[in-house]
């Protein structure tokens, strides 16, 4: 056997497929399922943004375009309020349940203060994003987001988004703190705290 010969071929002859595996109705010029699932560039092939079945599928486009950041018809302040409320609400749990004070009576309050601190840090980063004096980077339309919000990518829009994010983040953290402090969750809280117990 030579070094260029395929070891899976018998005696160097090409493999012959059985007729039952060959579909004779498909012609080479037909546009079929292979072309439908082919990966193509969105606009400029040198940018590196490719249109794949994942990012151009119906479910992905519907999900991404309904997120508060890309949803059409809402103001930048309301976008920031929704995004901040989700961040504040979701960050509260890990800070309260896995923080250093998780086994004390101050676990819920420490989680609240930690979450508000994290929201302040994220808000400071949003402020620093436009601090050099230029407008935020405008995202061009692509196969997933066909109409990105133009009012968000201005200095005024980004400032409104940042203030809404701060208010929503602090409000989401306070709401999660109030929810975890109710009597209805008193039976569940020791179980959740016991999952991450160190001792």
Curated annotation (Swiss-Prot):
Signal peptide: none annotated. This is Photosystem I reaction center subunit XI. One of its GO terms (cellular component) is plasma membrane-derived thylakoid membrane. Keywords: Membrane, Photosynthesis, Photosystem I, Thylakoid, Transmembrane, Transmembrane helix. The chain crosses the membrane at residues 81-101, 108-128, 165-185. It is found in: Cellular thylakoid membrane. It comes from the Bacteria.
């Amino acid at each position: 056997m030579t070094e260029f010969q395929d070891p899976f071929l018998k005696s160097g002859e090409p493999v012959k497929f059985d007729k039952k595996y060959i579909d004779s109705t498909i012609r080479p010029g037909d546009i079929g399922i292979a072309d439908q699932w082919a990966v193509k560039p969105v606009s400029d092939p040198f940018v590196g943004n490719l249109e794949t079945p994942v990012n151009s599928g119906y479910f992905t486009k519907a999900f991404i375009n309904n997120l508060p950041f890309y949803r059409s018809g809402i103001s930048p302040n309301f976008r920031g309020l929704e995004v901040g409320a989700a961040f504040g609400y979701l960050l509260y749990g890990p800070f309260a349940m896995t923080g250093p004070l998780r086994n004390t009576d101050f676990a819920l309050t420490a989680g609240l203060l930690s979450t508000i601190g994290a929201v302040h840090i994220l808000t400071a980063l949003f402020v620093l994003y436009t601090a050099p004096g230029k407008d935020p980077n405008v995202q061009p339309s692509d196969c997933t987001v066909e109409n990105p919000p133009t009012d968000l990518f201005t200095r005024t829009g980004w400032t409104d988004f940042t203030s809404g994010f701060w208010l929503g983040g602090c409000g989401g953290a306070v709401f999660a703190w109030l929810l975890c402090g109710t009597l209805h969750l008193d039976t569940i809280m020791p179980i959740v705290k016991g999952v991450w117990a160190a001792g």
